[in-house]
Amino acid sequence: VDSLTDAGFAVNPTIQALYTSDDWAQYKRGSENLGSFGNNLLSINDAPWSAFDADARSSVSQYGDAAIMVIGRIGGEGTDLLGKSKDGIDNGDGIGPDYLQLNANETSILDGLKEMKASGEIKHIIVLINYAGMIEGDFLADPDIDAALWVGALGVGGEAIGHLLIGDVSPSGRLPDTMWVDNAKNPVLVNYGRNYYSNLDEFGITDPDGANESTFSTYTVYQEGMYLGYKYTETRYEDLVLGTANVGDYDYASVVARPFGFGLSYADFELSGMSVTREGDRDYVVNVTVTNTSDTYSGKCSVPVYVSKPYGDYARENQIQVPSVELVDFGKTKILAPGESETLTITVDEKLFASYD
């Protein structure tokens, strides 16, 4: 809230008072430990649309330039995502299949805001994704959502949000991971979960049903190799386009909501004059000129450098994994005013081109 007011936004005091009230203390994210390190049942626990009384809803139109919805999750070291949540994605009870989907309460808020937008009470709907990872992004296809900003885990960086939304600063980052339309289409889920050793009792490890389950009672076998995230989605799409054998059916648009490296800016940029030269024994030097072609906004531009390697006979015969595209480095301009240019020089070590057997 301070970020918004510091940037010049007028924040609805009625809604703010609800979220800070004792009655609404029940609505907060949390986790319930299930008896071992890293084994937590996570709770989304956002307030449903029905929790907003008539006074709260009527106050919205007085601040109707935009409704900002924050979608948050927790998780990290010691708090693995179990693929399900305490409150689930159904109607508030039971266990849902995916903690990273919107749950029923969040969907009800979004639907309520859409109704207010349709009636003219609010003009825009903005979604902020407050999570260090990626939630399931199918809902972003909704045309009633005017803007979305992945803000990660905020910390001291939260102060920038208001200035980004109001246009004092142009966004210049890019997504550090793939945002899936449906997490079930992510191949890592095939191996994800808690697999218990069948003979754990022989070694004095607590039984899975015991009260003090040991951290050492479970295991995971990783099978996906290099084909994680964008290295999977882009490689499979290339195989489809090239007619590679055994690729199967693959609809990129129904799998990827936003690709790795996706990012927008208020400014427009044009890249030109790219050259690649070899220097020394192992360096490749990429030069590219970036020009801000917009008339109004200044901003920085992130320029990723990818390598695409041929999948030759040797790799095929020896079953060497070669993704169709790999990020090897990136550069970023200074703040460019409209019409201003900068030439970036990005040096890439040849070792990053290697494939490992």
PLM region descriptions:
Residues 1-357:
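C-terminal non-catalytic regions of proteins with extracellular/luminal or membrane-system context
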